[in-house]
């Protein structure tokens, strides 16, 4: 965590992080058997709040205490719930398509893994999209990797074949930037999806006889290109309406 003056905050560690189907479900605070199992519970709850995790367990190997951040209370339990039980307590009963979308893994390349806040941002956007939310707003500070986060969202929606209508096909996604340099930087971030990408530019539209390119799934453009060719793009959207799951 970065602080003012280019300093870094204290690093936090959890004893155990329980994950299932690419989803972080619970934190376990483990103590020796001669210690009070509730020692450190509040600290783990604080960690869970930062990591957007819904369940915390505190144990000394003899007793187990469960705290649910969903319900806002805790209780002693005889045994841990199964991973599937925790998953269903978090998401409820969901259909296979939604589960595929919200559990699809991140794209990992060259040993680069998303930071915890990037994971949270991506996961929340994915969950909202999978549950048919029409609009999702992510507010992120400078230097937090906004383009990387956008790539991970697009990659997971694309690979899991998420669609607003629930059909089994990849979505069409529009990435908008306000400057060409930002658009170019974004395209570089999306290099692993290169074969599925097309740029929408005035030059490209003129080259195609006034037609907007549609032979791709992920489109990159700047606002000016969209504004200058608004009528043609609207016509293309109408013509392609059966195939388009959404523009973003």
Positions of PLM-derived features:
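ATP-dependent helicase/translocase motor core
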Residues: 1-26, 30-172, 177, 181-197, ...
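Functional beta-strand-loop-alpha-helix junction segments that form "active/interaction loops"
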Residues: 197-212
């Amino acid at each position: 965590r970065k602080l003012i003056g280019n300093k870094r905050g204290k690093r936090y560690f959890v004893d155990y992080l329980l994950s299932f189907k690419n989803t972080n479900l619970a934190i376990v605070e483990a103590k020796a058997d001669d210690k009070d199992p509730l020692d450190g519970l509040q600290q783990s709850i604080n960690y869970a709040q930062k990591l957007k995790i819904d369940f915390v367990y505190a144990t000394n190997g003899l007793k187990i205490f469960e705290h649910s951040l969903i319900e806002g209370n805790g209780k002693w339990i005889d045994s841990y719930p199964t991973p599937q039980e925790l998953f269903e307590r978090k998401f409820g009963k969901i259909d296979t398509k939604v589960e595929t979308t919200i559990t699809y893994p991140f794209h990992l390349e060259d040993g680069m893994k998303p930071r915890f806040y990037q994971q949270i941002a991506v996961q929340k956007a994915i969950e909202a999209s999978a549950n048919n939310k029409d609009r999702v707003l992510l507010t992120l500070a400078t230097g937090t990797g906004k383009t990387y986060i956008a790539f991970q969202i697009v990659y997971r929606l694309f690979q899991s074949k998420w669609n607003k209508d629930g059909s089994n096909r990849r979505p069409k996604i529009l990435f908008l930037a306000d400057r060409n340099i930002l658009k170019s930087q974004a395209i570089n971030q999306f290099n692993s999806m290169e074969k599925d990408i097309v740029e929408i530019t005035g030059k490209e539209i003129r080259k195609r006889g006034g037609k907007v390119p549609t032979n791709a799934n992920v489109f990159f453009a700047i606002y000016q290109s969209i504004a200058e060719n608004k009528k043609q793009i609207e016509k293309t959207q109408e013509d392609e309406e059966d195939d388009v799951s959404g523009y973003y």
